[in-house]
Regions:
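Anaerobic metallocofactor- and corrinoid-dependent redox/one-carbon enzyme cores
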Residues: 1-174
Length: 174
């Protein structure tokens, strides 16, 4: 964050539009909260490495990739770093995929999952709705990843040919 902030200020920009209005509406009022939430989505496994954009993962375990906030630039960077599946959580319904790596879209709420069922693979709103525990949902996500990786199920972004690909140009991208 510090390096990115310096880069933004060097070209006369900053984080005044980040988090986005949609993020703020949903409670992500600072970059720190947004970043902490992104890290938490990795679960309880220890972070073994923090990678620069497109830097190849070389260690077994959970690595974080420093990407811009733009969804397509972020998924492109993760695929370039070696991701073989991208689990993309969304509370607003970003319709994105990747031509190199299957993107599994995970809705954070049931309203979104129902409204955009054509692009959502997994609804984690069942946790908030009291239908499933975090552990049960984790098992469901793991099972989906296994069948998607084996080709038994094709994620909706792949079915819909949502082949979005935008490399980050190393400028300021919020």
């Amino acid at each position: 964050m510090e390096d990115y902030n310096k880069m933004a200020h060097a070209v006369g920009s900053g984080f005044h539009m980040n988090p986005s209005p949609g993020n703020i509406k949903d409670g992500l009022i600072t970059d720190a909260i947004k970043s902490a939430g992104a890290c938490k989505k990795g679960g309880t496994a220890p972070v073994v490495d923090v990678l620069d954009y497109t830097e190849p993962a070389t260690k077994a375990g959970l690595s974080l990739v420093c990407t811009p906030g733009n969804d397509v630039e972020a998924t492109t960077g993760k695929a370039a770093s070696g991701a073989t599946l991208i689990l993309f959580t969304t509370g607003l319904g970003t319709p994105t995929g990747n031509p190199v790596c299957p993107v599994i879209k995970i809705a954070t709420n049931t309203k979104l999952a129902n409204k955009m069922s054509d692009i959502i693979d997994i609804n984690t709103g069942d946790i908030i709705d009291g239908i499933k525990t975090i552990e049960q949902m984790g098992e469901e996500i793991l099972e989906y990843c296994i069948v998607a990786a084996s080709g038994e199920v094709i994620p909706k972004a792949v079915q819909l040919q949502q082949d979005d690909f935008i490399p980050w140009k190393r400028g300021v991208s919020l």
